[in-house]
Regions:
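Internal transmembrane alpha-helical bundles of multi-pass membrane proteins
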Residues: 14-17, 242-408
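OB-fold/S1-family single-stranded nucleic acid-binding modules
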Residues: 96, 127-149
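Aromatic-rich juxtamembrane segments at the membrane interface
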Residues: 139-249, 254-255
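N-terminal leader/targeting segments
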Residues: 1-73, 396, 400
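Structural detector for short beta-strands of small beta-barrel domains
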Residues: 73-90
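Beta-strand/loop nucleic-acid-binding surfaces
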Residues: 97-112
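Flexible glycine-rich surface loops and low-complexity tracts that mediate binding to linear polymers
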Residues: 112-134
Length: 408
C-alpha cells in the first residue's frame, strides 16, 4: 500500500465526486461505457495508491452517486413553492428545493426573484447538464410575501434602472454586470468588447470581484462583519458558482487563521468544489464553475514560478502578468473548445483595463447603498461615464492595431 501523496486527501475526493457525476450521465446513455470508465479509474487508484485508499475513495464515490440520484429523482408535489430564476414571455424556470424546473403558463407580472406557491402538473423531463428535473405546467399560483432574496433582486433592478436613467442602457448594463452580476440587459456589443480585450471573465461575478469587495470591507469593517456582508453580496449577485466558490475559500482561509492552521489552497479549492457539487451536481457542466476552478488551480500551480521568472519587471506589472498567465494556462483550452475563439490580448487587457474595471466594481457596489442620495449618485455617475469612455477608446485603439478575429 502506497500512502505517499495522500496527506492531502481532498483533491482525490473532489476528483471522485467529479467522476461520479459524469458517470451518472454516461450511465443513462451507455451502461457499459460508464462501468468501464469507473472500474478503470479505481484500478488505477489501487495500483498506485493501494487497496485501502481505493476502498475509501469508493465509499465517497458511492456517497456522491447517491446524492446525484436523490437530486435528479426528486418529484415535486402538486402544490410547491418555486423561486423564479428566469422569465421569458409565458415561460420560465424556477427552483424547487435546489432543483430546476421548466415553467409554462407564467403570468407576465411574475419577476425573477419572486417566490410563488404553484399548483400544477409536473412531468419528468430531465436535462442532467442543466440541472432540470422536469416541466411544471402551472394551473394556479400565488405570489408569496417578498422575502430577503426577493428584496435583493428588486434592489438590483432598481439600481440598474437608476443608472440607466443617467447613462443609458449600455453603460448601465456594463456597470451592473461587472459590479454585481446583473447582466440581463448586457448587449452583444459589450460582450464582444470584453472578449476583444481578453477580459470577458469580468462580466460574470467571480472570485476576482468577491475578493476585491471583501478586501475593501475587511479594511473598513473588520473580518466578522465583512464575512457577513460578503455573503449578502454573493446572494445579491445571484450566488453564481464562482462567487460561492470564492466565498467558501475566504471562509476557510479566515477560519484557518483563527485556529492557527496553515492554509492549503489546493485543499481549500477541492473542499469548495465538493460542497458546491453536493448542493448542485449539475455545476460540473456549468462553464462558469469549470473556468473558475481551472483558473484558480492554474494560479495555485503556476503563479509562484511565473512570478520568479518575471523578477525583472516592476512588482505590480509582474504580479498582474503572472496571475493572468497562470489563470489562462488551464482555462485557455476550455475557452477555445467552448467558445471556438480566443483573444490573445488578455495580458494587455488585464494590465491596462482591469484596474479601471476594479474601480467600476467598487463604485457600482457603493451605488447599492447610496443610489437615493442624488448628489453622491450623480458624482459617481460622472466618474463611471469617463471610465467607460476610456475603456471604449482603448478598445478601439487595440482594434486598429491587432487582429481581433480570434483563433477559430
Amino acid at each position: 500500500m502506497n500512502n505517499k501523496g495522500f496527506n492531502n486527501p481532498l483533491p482525490y475526493i473532489f476528483i471522485v465526486f467529479i467522476l461520479s457525476y459524469f458517470s451518472y450521465e454516461i450511465y443513462s446513455k451507455n451502461i457499459i461505457l460508464a462501468s468501464f470508465y469507473v472500474v478503470s479509474f479505481f484500478i488505477f487508484i489501487m495500483y498506485f495508491k493501494g487497496k485501502y485508499i481505493m476502498f475509501i475513495l469508493v465509499l465517497f464515490f458511492v456517497a456522491a452517486l447517491n446524492n446525484t440520484i436523490c437530486f435528479y429523482n426528486y418529484t415535486p408535489k402538486e402544490v410547491e413553492e418555486v423561486r423564479i430564476t428566469e422569465v421569458k414571455n409565458y415561460y420560465g424556470k424556477g427552483e424547487v428545493n435546489g432543483r430546476i424546473v421548466s415553467l409554462s403558463n407564467i403570468n407576465e407580472n411574475i419577476e425573477v426573484g419572486n417566490k410563488i406557491l404553484v399548483k400544477g402538473k409536473f412531468t419528468e423531463n430531465k436535462n442532467i447538464s442543466n440541472g432540470v428535473i422536469g416541466d411544471y405546467k402551472i394551473e394556479d399560483y400565488k405570489v408569496l410575501k417578498s422575502d430577503f432574496i426577493d428584496k435583493l433582486y428588486k434592489r438590483r433592478k432598481y439600481v440598474f434602472e437608476s443608472i440607466e436613467s443617467k447613462l443609458g442602457e449600455r453603460k448601465a448594463a456594463l456597470i451592473t454586470s461587472v459590479s454585481f452580476g446583473y447582466k440581463g440587459e448586457l448587449n452583444e456589443d459589450h460582450k464582444e468588447l470584453m472578449k476583444n480585450l481578453g477580459i470577458s471573465h469580468v462580466i460574470s461575478i467571480s472570485g476576482l470581484h468577491l475578493v476585491l469587495v471583501y478586501s475593501v470591507l475587511r479594511r473598513l469593517l473588520g473580518v466578522k462583519l465583512s464575512l457577513i456582508l460578503a455573503l449578502v453580496y454573493v446572494l445579491f449577485s445571484g450566488a453564481s458558482a464562482p462567487a460561492v466558490r470564492a466565498y467558501i475559500m475566504i471562509v476557510i482561509l479566515t477560519f484557518g487563521k483563527i485556529v492557527k492552521r496553515n492554509y492549503n489552497p489546493l485543499a481549500s479549492l477541492s473542499l469548495a468544489g465538493i460542497i458546491l457539487l453536493l448542493i448542485k451536481p449539475y455545476y460540473i457542466y456549468n462553464i462558469g464553475y469549470v473556468l473558475s476552478f481551472l483558473a484558480t488551480l492554474g494560479i495555485i500551480l503556476f503563479n509562484k514560478d511565473l512570478n520568479k521568472k518575471l523578477y525583472k519587471l516592476p512588482n505590480s506589472i509582474r504580479n498582474t502578468i503572472a496571475i493572468s498567465l497562470s489563470a489562462q494556462i488551464l482555462t485557455l483550452p476550455i475557452i477555445i473548445l467552448y467558445f471556438n475563439e480566443v483573444s490573445l490580448n488578455f495580458i494587455v487587457g488585464n494590465i491596462v483595463v482591469i484596474p479601471f474595471i476594479n474601480v467600476l466594481v467598487v463604485l457600482g457596489n457603493i451605488l447599492i447603498f447610496i443610489v437615493e442620495i442624488s448628489s453622491v449618485f450623480n458624482y459617481i455617475m460622472y466618474v463611471c461615464h469617463y471610465i467607460i469612455k476610456y475603456i471604449d477608446i482603448f478598445n478601439v485603439f487595440l482594434y486598429n492595431i491587432v487582429n481581433f478575429e480570434g483563433v477559430k
